[in-house]
Amino acid sequence: MAFLELDHVSVVFPAVQGMLSSRKPASVVAVDGVSLSVEKGEILGLVGESGCGKSTLSRTVMLLQKPTEGRIFLEGEELTALSPSEVRKRRPDFQMVFQDPYASLNPRFTVYATLKEALECRRRKRTFSQMRDDVAELMERVG
């Protein structure tokens, strides 16, 4: 079983038209039938020209954008079938660093402080030594 799996994921947006247009509303296909799988510990890079759907696909995987079609699985659980409240419960289990790292990461924080802050957001109380050990374990896991 893949850690992350996308099964024919598509995202279609309605196109903006003028008020006097008599044509049927058009649509823009931002992501068209993407299927992929990522194993635990594997790294995947999305590469493509500007406007090809990389950010839309990433936001869709994070459930910040609903797919028009297809399914997304994380560790075998279908994320696209979750209710909004279930999505909120699962959201701390995955994270995305957006294209502008300065909007996502504080350049004045050390790596330790950044990881510590992420762990603190999960609302689990830890002693100083537990937190230090947890951050060290995370750093070891990512290399």
Segments (PLM) and residue ranges:
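Conserved ABC ATPase "signature" region
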Residues: 78, 129-143
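ABC ATPase NBD coupling module
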Residues: 20-25, 66, 79-95, 121-124, ...
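The feature captures the beta-strand-to-loop junction immediately N-terminal to the Walker
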Residues: 47-49
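ATP-binding/catalytic-site motifs of ATP-hydrolyzing domains
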Residues: 71-73, 77
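Helix-to-loop junction immediately C-terminal to a conserved catalytic motif
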Residues: 62
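Q-loop/switch helix immediately C-terminal to the Walker
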Residues: 100, 109-121
